[in-house]
Amino acid sequence: MNNTTLDYYNHNAERFTSGTLDVQFTAVQDRFLGYLAPGARILDYGCGSGRDSRYFLSKGYQVEACDGSEEMVKIATKTAGIAVKQMLFEELDETARYDGIFACASILHVPSKALPDIFRRLKRAVKKDGIVYVSFKYGTFEGERNGRYFTDLTEEGLQKILTAADPAHPFVVVDQWISGDARPGRADEKWLNAILQ
């Protein structure tokens, strides 16, 4: 994630939280949890406000959470009630630790040329047969928009990046869907959602 994007979240943490914390997101959260055993270990990767971590904890899952923004980490720690780690995406360095990784509207801030490395890190961090949920704004735009860097993806764009990350054994897309934005007044904005294994 570039410094401009981190600065955006550090300076707008409260405003961002007020616009996302109470968004009804259980359809996506439960779809992800449907692939996991009860009590599984989850990493909320780029956790933002901590909304999803709080939900997963309430359902009895073991949750670790991280975010690159110092201010978002403070908010997420309060929201989720756990110690949230301040960490950049490229600092993930775990091996077979998690049953599931939830990267909701987070790694879309990574430039496309750096995404293969991020997916390699995600693949290494999940256990054998573990799953990873990712979401990206739907499309082909890449660059700065409203003070943040975005990489928008289509199904084809995601598959190219997954193949580039590991040509011999890429993540398999086990579930994929297009959704509208869950925030009020933004239903016309489309999102690519995928569950990888």
Language-model-detected regions and their locations in the chain:
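Short, conserved loop/helix-junction motifs that constitute active-site signature segments
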Residues: R124
